[in-house]
């Protein structure tokens, strides 16, 4: 059986130092990018708080979330439910590695949310011993010397504000599908399905480790 990993993404309120997660998506994948299980959770304690959601990055999506919740495409749950679902999923597949693109931010977001809304005896979201990998770190290694990727970003003006090559998930995925007009959904699970493709491409390019710490 191929080794399994979890790819995770969050959408949060706007406070960078203490971001609070209102959308948490994750998928179980292998190194080839195959998906074995996925979950899309809208976090009730944050999403139903109008004051907190007023500072959400993508507040314009609130009505879309409600429609998708009613259709069963996403589940409105307490944060503890999302956490225990992830923990149970890790146990089910024997997963020790969780990754995200720009993982420091998502790691901070789930821990900040955990400390604000959940049982205070659990200070950290992930089980003890979980390895956190960063597909951004992996992508910089995999694409950093790729002249074709640098040219793609330059030709389509997909560079950073200071003119350097961008390694956002959106821009890397644009390159992978050769479509500079592609736009990320900026919803948890949908962005996960982009990030798992980036992970798989990094592995194909020989980058097989992305430990953040």
For the regions a protein language model found, what residue spans apply to each?
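Short, polar/flexible loop-turn hinges at active-site or ligand-entry regions and domain interfaces
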Residues: 69-73, 120-126, 179-185
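Short alpha-helix plus adjacent loop in nuclease-associated cores
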Residues: 132-160
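Conserved protein kinase catalytic core
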Residues: 15-17, 140, 197
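Substrate-recognition/cap helix-loop segment adjacent to the acidic, metal-dependent catalytic center
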Residues: 104-133
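Conserved non-catalytic scaffold segment of RNase H-like nuclease domains
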Residues: 2-113
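Acidic, Mg2+-coordinating catalytic module of metal-dependent nucleases/exonucleases
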Residues: 97-104, 108-109, 153-213
């Amino acid at each position: 059986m191929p080794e399994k990993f979890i790819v995770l993404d969050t959408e949060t309120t706007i406070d960078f130092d203490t971001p609070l997660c209102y959308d948490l998506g994750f998928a179980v994948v292998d190194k080839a990018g195959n998906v074995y299980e996925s979950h899309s959770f809208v976090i009730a304690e944050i999403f139903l708080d109008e004051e907190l959601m007023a500072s959400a990055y993508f507040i314009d999506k609130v009505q879309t979330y409600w429609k998708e919740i009613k259709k069963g495409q996403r589940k409105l749950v307490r944060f503890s439910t999302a956490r225990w679902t992830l923990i149970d999923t890790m146990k089910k597949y024997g997963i020790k590695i969780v990754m995200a693109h720009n993982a420091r931010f998502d790691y901070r977001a789930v821990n900040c949310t955990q400390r604000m809304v959940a049982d205070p005896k659990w200070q950290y979201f992930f089980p003890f011993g979980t390895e956190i990998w960063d597909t951004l770190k992996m992508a910089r290694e995999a694409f950093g010397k790729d002249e074709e990727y640098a040219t793609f970003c330059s030709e389509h003006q997909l560079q950073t504000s200071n003119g350097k090559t961008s390694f956002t998930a959106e821009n890397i995925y644009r390159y992978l599908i050769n479509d500079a007009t592609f736009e990320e959904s900026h919803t948890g699970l949908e962005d996960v399905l982009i990030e798992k493709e980036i992970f798989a491409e990094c592995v194909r390019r020989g980058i097989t480790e992305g430990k953040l710490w």
